[in-house]
């Protein structure tokens, strides 16, 4: 039963967290590169 709606929870989390995390890491990398 849990496996039935697990993808419905997992997909939005991956779809929202992964792009946000990659954007945050890129922003931090750009800031560090700009400062130095």
Swiss-Prot record:
InterPro entries hit by this protein: PSI_PsaI, PSI_PsaI_sf
Keywords noted in UniProt: Chloroplast, Membrane, Photosynthesis, Photosystem I, Plastid, Thylakoid, Transmembrane, Transmembrane helix
Domain of life: Eukaryota
Residues annotated as transmembrane: 8-28
Example of a GO biological process term: photosynthesis
Principal location: plastid
Function, as annotated: May help in the organization of the PsaL subunit.
NCBIfam families recorded: PS_I_psaI (TIGR03052)
Protein name as it appears in the record: Photosystem I reaction center subunit VIII
């Amino acid at each position: 039963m849990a496996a039935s709606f697990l993808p419905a929870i997992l997909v939005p989390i991956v779809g929202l967290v992964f792009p946000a995390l990659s954007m945050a890491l890129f922003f931090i990398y750009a800031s560090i590169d700009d400062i130095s």
